[in-house]
């Protein structure tokens, strides 16, 4: 009876608590409503900026070309250039008359007082003419 020790056995209890692991995606992969709206307006503003730049470039190119044309002296005298511009607006006149054998009284009464004339502008393909 005396061979056992009177000290109690110590028991070590270990409890492991693990934090709940959530599989979260990075912040930039989870867009919010505000971020989508901001991206939309940024895209619209960027598009307007690009269109404005293209417009200004085209406008400045037109100014460069028009100022280059006014600085170059014309190779021909101005009187000849003005006569060419008047000649470029040439009109043709044509009168259509129906054949007499196929016309009836209705068309004969209406077409007797009228003389239809067709005007057509003739385009000149000479590139030496100044543009208005």
Swiss-Prot record:
Membrane topology: Single-pass membrane protein
Residue positions where Phosphoserine is found in the record: 111
InterPro entries cross-referenced by the UniProt entry: C1orf162 (IPR037763)
Keyword Transmembrane helix belongs to the record: yes
Compartment list: Membrane
Lineage top rank: taxon: Eukaryota
Annotated region described as Disordered, given as residue ranges: 95-132
Listed Polar residues bias regions: 104-124
TM stretches of this protein: 36-56
UniProt keyword terms in alphabetical order: Membrane, Phosphoprotein, Transmembrane, Transmembrane helix
GO CC annotations, alphabetized: membrane
Name this polypeptide is given: Transmembrane protein C1orf162 homolog
Organism this protein belongs to: Mus musculus (Mouse)
Phylogenetic classification of the source organism: Eukaryota, Metazoa, Chordata, Craniata, Vertebrata
